[in-house]
């Protein structure tokens, strides 16, 4: 039984609605519009909202949306066919009113579709009871067939040619063992007395003849080669003198006194740092203002300059033919027209480090958006699809919620409490380093920071954060801010409960008047249940204002797995009624990937959370805010 069925325009006018079991369809339909239609996530034609499953169909020619809702515990096999039938009948019956495409005509139009809909619903329900014999799904219809081609996968190991040769050798050995030449040594056809021809049952290909000639050569000259190889090995020098180790600029020293960190330390203001290290670690640029991410390179500037120069080789005739080539006319797009272009776009996205499943969903969303749409006069299919994909990518990188830390910190100051930020992520992604960058950015904006060392698992984690605190304190001494200490470290050593340390740090910050508390947590893999339980406990007990997931820009499919499992673990291990999930993303090591920026798309698409910061280097000033248009331009670059 259906809960509701509604037809509305993309402008928001409800043309017709059928109310079944549900009292109102406003809430589910509004959730569909906010979460799917406006966010360009139409790759799948179904959407789940609370206890309902919504299926929808877009009519891009007349700018209509058809939505049906039913209980998600039900399996209604006729829903897809029902939407197609209703779409076809409604469009044909009210074509005149719809073609005017004006709000006044749609408001004045009378869409009496109740009897027709009930008739179609009755027919679909009766036809679903008569079950047709089930047929096996073809490989082309499976999910595996939709995944990228094998040519996009770079495998390590032996080359394909070598594998083909080995398989041919194995096949030839089997044939020789089964035939009349099954002896200890491979004997050529000429010596065996049997002519190589089909009449004697021996048909040799060109590859087999070459292989047999090679075996004869190895049998004759193999012993000499083995002796020569042994002699060359024995003549080699035994061992050279050891190379002197290279001394790096910031490599430190190996003195025992310098490396001894076992002395007891106390919380509070850190010691002063050497000035030469400070000048190197700060970097250049304004620290208090986040600059937009710039993904352009020198190659892009050269191509832009070359494109701006007029080409003297092309004449008026070539320009006329180019104009006629782009002349397509008012054509309605179909899936067959877009199939080849979408395949190329999907492979291009995967090559730029977008996760394979997300690339498929993006292309499917673009196909649903453009199917039935009338193209412009001078537009081609490729340009239309590319423009629609660019618009979808920009929309994905601009999610619903925008995180403004400075505004939220000022709001927390008015309530006389510290603003708490928790960093989480897998091992080695740069949580502590980017925590220090964000600390420097906050210090440049005049906020005092308390760093809570809650990584009690990794050896050297507390010393790592202490080093950053010492350098940040040297960059912002108390004299620079008229007395008060701007940055301090709160730590309780190793092996303690991280949730308890974070709670004590927040209480200490409230008593001492700190503006921000940055909580550094231990790196953990997404499948490590004990550590994920400890992270969920830390977030549930302390209720931070912001939970940031730190991820690398180097990963592809792994980004989706990490974010999905982190959110799932936080929800499963949380003791709260409404579990706290990830609020934002910090994308690190962005300076190492050139134009393969697909991880930004994968992370934002799978979580619908914004990328708050982007790490672009190893100094404190190497922190950027995400520029969606620059990322999309780098992603679409050939």
From Swiss-Prot:
Chain positions found as Phosphoserine: 177, 296-298, 473
Subcellular location: Endoplasmic reticulum membrane
Any matching Pfam family: SRP-alpha_N
Keyword flag DNA repair: no
Gene3D superfamilies according to UniProt: 3.30.450.60, P-loop containing nucleotide triphosphate hydrolases (3.40.50.300), Signal recognition particle SRP54, nucleotide-binding domain (1.20.120.140)
Main subcellular location of this protein, as a coarse class: endoplasmic reticulum
Name of the protein: Signal recognition particle receptor subunit alpha
Organism: Canis lupus familiaris (Dog)
Gene name, Swiss-Prot/TrEMBL: SRPRA
């Amino acid at each position: 039984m259906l809960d509701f069925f509604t037809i509305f325009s993309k402008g928001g006018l409800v043309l017709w609605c059928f109310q079944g079991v549900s009292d109102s369809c406003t809430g589910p339909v509004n959730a569909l519009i906010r979460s799917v239609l406006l966010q360009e996530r139409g790759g799948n034609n179904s959407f789940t909202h609370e206890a309902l499953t919504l299926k929808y169909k877009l009519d891009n020619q007349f700018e209509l949306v058809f939505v049906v809702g039913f209980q998600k515990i039900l399996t209604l096999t006729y829903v897809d066919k029902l939407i197609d039938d209703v779409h076809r009948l409604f469009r044909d019956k009210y074509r005149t009113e719809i073609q005017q495409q004006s709000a006044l005509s749609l408001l004045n139009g009378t869409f009496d579709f109740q009897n027709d809909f009930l008739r179609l619903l009755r027919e679909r329900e009766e036809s679903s009871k008569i079950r047709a014999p089930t047929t096996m799904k073809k490989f082309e219809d499976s999910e595996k067939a939709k995944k990228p081609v094998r040519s996009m996968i770079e495998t390590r190991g032996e080359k394909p040619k070598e594998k083909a040769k080995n398989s041919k050798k194995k096949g030839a050995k089997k044939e020789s063992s089964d035939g009349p030449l099954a002896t200890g040594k491979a004997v050529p056809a000429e010596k065996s007395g049997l002519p190589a021809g089909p009449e004697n049952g021996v048909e040799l290909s060109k590859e087999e003849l070459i292989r047999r000639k090679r075996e004869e050569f190895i049998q004759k000259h193999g012993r000499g080669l083995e002796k020569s190889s042994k002699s060359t090995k024995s003549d080699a020098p035994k061992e050279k003198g050891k190379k002197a180790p290279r001394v790096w600029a910031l490599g430190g020293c190996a003195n025992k006194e310098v490396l001894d960190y076992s002395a007891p330390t106390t919380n509070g203001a850190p010691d002063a740092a050497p000035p030469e290290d400070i000048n190197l670690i700060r970097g250049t640029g304004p620290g208090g203002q986040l600059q937009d991410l710039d993904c352009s390179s020198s190659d892009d500037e050269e191509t832009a300059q070359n494109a701006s120069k007029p080409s003297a080789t092309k004449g008026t005739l070539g320009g006329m033919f180019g104009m006629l080539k782009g002349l397509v006319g008012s054509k309605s797009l179909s899936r067959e027209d877009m199939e080849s272009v979408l395949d190329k776009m999907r492979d291009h996205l995967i090559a730029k480090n977008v996760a394979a499943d997300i690339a498929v969903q993006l292309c499917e969303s673009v196909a649903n958006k453009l199917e039935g749409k009338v193209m412009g006069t001078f537009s081609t299919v490729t340009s239309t699809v590319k423009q629609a994909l660019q618009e979808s990518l920009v929309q994905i990188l601009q999610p619903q919620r925008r995180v403004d830390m400075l505004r939220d910190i000022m709001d927390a100051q008015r309530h006389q409490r510290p603003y708490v930020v928790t960093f989480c992520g897998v091992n080695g992604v740069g949580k502590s380093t980017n925590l220090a960058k964000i600390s420097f950015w906050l210090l440049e904006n005049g906020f005092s920071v308390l760093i809570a060392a809650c990584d009690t698992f990794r050896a050297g984690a507390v010393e790592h954060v202490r080093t950053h605190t010492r350098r940040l304190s040297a960059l912002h001494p108390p004299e620079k801010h008229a007395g008060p200490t701007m940055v301090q470290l709160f730590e309780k050593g190793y092996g303690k409960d991280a949730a308890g340390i974070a709670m004590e740090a927040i209480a200490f910050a409230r008593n001492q008047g700190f503006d921000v508390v940055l909580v550094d947590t231990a790196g953990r893999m997404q499948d490590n249940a004990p550590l994920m339980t400890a992270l969920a406990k830390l977030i549930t007990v302390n209720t931070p204002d912001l939970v940031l997931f730190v991820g690398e820009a180097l990963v592809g499919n792994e980004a989706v797995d990490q974010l999905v499992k982190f959110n799932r673990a936080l929800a499963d291990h949380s003791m709260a009624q409404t579990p706290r999930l990830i609020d934002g993303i910090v994308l690190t090591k962005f300076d190492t990937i050139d134009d393969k920026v697909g991880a930004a798309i994968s992370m934002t698409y799978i979580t619908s959370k914004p990328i708050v910061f982007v790490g672009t280097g190893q100094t404190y000033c190497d922190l950027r805010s995400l520029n969606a248009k620059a990322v999309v331009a780098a992603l679409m670059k050939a």
